[in-house]
Amino acid sequence: MKLDRKKKRLLLKTIFSIVILILPLTFLHPTNSTVSSQNQVPIQIIYNYNVSGGVIYTAPLNIPSGFYNYYMINQYGTLLYSYLFSTNPAFVVWYEPQPTTETYYFVYGQSVTSQLVSTDVFSLYTQFYIYNSSMWNISNGVVSGGVLTLNGKNSILTENYTAPRYTSALWLYQILSPQSVSPTQIVYTSPIPPGSLIIVHVLTYTGSYQVPYPAIAQYNTPYIIAESYTSQYLTANSTHYYYYYNSLKYVGSMQQSLPFITTVSTNGLIFYSSAKNSQVLLPGATLPATSYTTNSTFIAGQLVGTGIDSYSINPSFVWCPEWIVNGSIQLLNGCKVPITGHYQLDKSTYAVILNSVFNSSDDELIAPVNSIVTVTYSNGTSYSFTVTGSSIYSGLPVPLVVVKFYGVGVTGIHISTNAFGINQQYSALIGFTDLLHTYGVLIQNGEAYSYIAGTKGPALGNVTFPMVVAVGEFAVGNTYYVFGEIVTTSRVFPFIQQSSYAIQPTIAYVNYNGTIPLVIQSVAETLSTGTYYELSGIAAMNVGQPTPINSVILSVVSQPGLEIVGSNGNVYSTIVQNTSAPNLVLVGFQGYSITLVYTNVQQNLVVTTNNFPVNLPSDMPLLVAIDQASRSITITVGQTQTQSIFMKTIPVNTTTPAVSLPIPNYPGNIIVDPESELTVISYYIIGAVAIVSMAYGTKIWIGVFIFAIS
C-alpha cells in the first residue's frame, strides 16, 4: 500500500531532522583510526602553598617510545611551552608561568600536530646541548655526530671552564645503553641464503629484535652484517692478503695476518692498517679506526688450500662503528643511507659469527658460551641448544665456542645471550661539580646511589639502560640540598639529601670507569636564577596512565564520602557527607573493568555492583580515567608527598608570549575562574574541548556538548 502525501511529507521531515541532529556529531567525532591513534597522559599537580613566579616541571611518562608528535596542554585549554627531553624513556619538561593546583595533559599520537616542541621556543628557560668538541672538556671519550661515548678508562666530561658557571641548576642527562649492562637477547631471523656469513655484534640494544631478509636499511637492523657469496676471484698479487670464510668449508684458523691492503674497486669490507703492519682479525678483537675504509667495502681472505691468496664476497648489508653518525647513518654497498633509532656500536665488542655452507648438514656457529641458540627450519620445526665447550681463543671478553647444527632448510637463527655469566664492571658518577666537591648519582654495576661531596648514600635500587638522570641543588637559608631522580623505561628512583658543604657555582660533571662504554646522547640545564623549592609538603605530582583521547578524566583526592557517578552518559564527582563512608565509591559502573595503579603496583578489578567501594587510603591524589566505549576505568593513585617533580622559579621580569587556543562559547553562562568553587571536572571539560578542537583545526563546534557540573 502506498503512503499518502501527508505521511510521506512527515517521513521526510523526520529523516531531515535526524540528519540535522547527527551532522554536527560527524564533525566532532573523528574516525575510529584517528581516535585510537591519539592518547593522553593526565598529570595532576597539587600545591599546599602558594608559589609565585614561573615553574619548570619534569615528569617521566609511562608511554611507548615509538610515538610520533605531542603537545602539552593545561586544564584550561592553553598550550604550554614544553620539550620532550627523551623518548626512551619518555621524559617531558614544561614551563608554567603561574603554577596552581591543576591537571595537565600530555597528548600524543600519529594524528597529533606537534606544538611548541623546539629548543628555540624553550631556550628562554632551559639550554639543551648536543655534544660537540668545543663546549666540553672530554678525556678518554669519542664524540661522533652528537653522541659521546666514554670508553671507561677514567673517562671524564665537564663543561668548558670558560662557560658560565651556574649558581643553581638542574642537570638532565640522556644516557643510552652501554654495550650491554644487562644483556637480554640478540635475534637474527631470516632465510639463510647459501654461503651467507652473518656477524652479530653484542651492543647497546637490549631485547628481542627481528631482522627480515634481505637485511636492508629500512628494516633498521642495528647489529647485522649479512654477506652473500656471489663474486668471482680477484687477481692475486703479493700486496693483497685477505681474510676469507670459505664458501665450501669453514676455515678453521681464525687468526690470519693481514698486511696492508690497497683499495679495491669491488664492494666489500677492507681490513687494513695504514702503518702497513700485520693485523690479527679474530672474534672480539679490537680493530682500530684505521681498520675500516668507506670508499670500498668487502670481506675477503686467503683461500685455504688453493694457492689463491685473494678472494671476495659481496655484502648485502654492512654496519660498522666508523659509519655511525648519531645512530642514524649506515653504509649500504658504499652509499650512506638514513635509518631510525639511536644505537651505538663499540669497536671492542665481541661478535657472534655464523657460516652457512650451502645448506650443508654441518653448519657452524661461533657464539658466546652459555648462550641459547634456536634454529628454525622450513618445515616448521625448531631445534634449541645451549652453547657449551672450550673457547676457541683465550683472552676474549666473552668465551666463544664453535658449535655445529644441521643446516639444510634453515629459515632462522635465534641467539639468546641473557646467560653470559660475564662479570662486567663499571662505575659512573653523573651530576655536577663546583670544582671543590662533586654531587650527583653513582651507578655501579647496575646499582644506583646518591653521591654527595665524596659520600655514597643509601642504595636507590637496581637500574637499567637507557635512562634519564636529573640532578640539581637548592638552598633553604644556609642549608644546601641535592636532589634528583633516575628514570628508566620501567621505574623512577627519586632522592633528596642534605649537603654538609655550601655548594658553589656549578658545572656539568661525569666521571666513568668500566669494561664497557657509556653513551651520552644529550644534556640540558635550567636557568641559574631563581630558587629551587624543597618539594616535601609543597607540591605533589601524580602522573596517570595513557588513556584514549575521548576518555573522561577526573582529578580528585580520596576522602570519606567521595563518589564518582556515571548517569545517562554523564560522569562527575561528588562528596557525600559521611565520615564512615569509604574513601572512594564508583556509582553506576557495574560491569566496568578497573585498572588500579598504586605505588607502581597494578591491580585489575571488576565492578560487580552499582555502588562499588574501592579500598584506598584517604587524602591520596587520584587521577580517574573513564573510557565509556571500552567500559574501562583506570585509577592512578599518587602520593601525599613526592620528590619526583622539580620546580624552579623564573624571574618575575621574564616575559612569556601567550599561546592559547580559541576560547569556546559554552552553552549557557558558564564562567570558569581558577578561584571559583567549580569542581575539577568543570576544568577538565575545557581541556577536553580544547583537545578535540586541536584535532580538527581552530573551529570549535558549539551546542552538542552536554556538561554535568556538580
From Swiss-Prot:
Its main location: host cell. Keywords: Host membrane, Membrane, Signal, Transmembrane, Transmembrane helix. The keyword Thylakoid does not apply. Residues 1-33 form the signal peptide. It comes from the Viruses. The keyword Transmembrane applies. GO terms for cellular component: host cell membrane; membrane. The chain crosses the membrane at residues 41-61, 76-95, 689-709. It is found in: Host membrane. It is a multi-pass membrane protein. Coiled coil: none annotated. This is Putative transmembrane protein ORF710. It comes from Acidianus two-tailed virus (ATV).
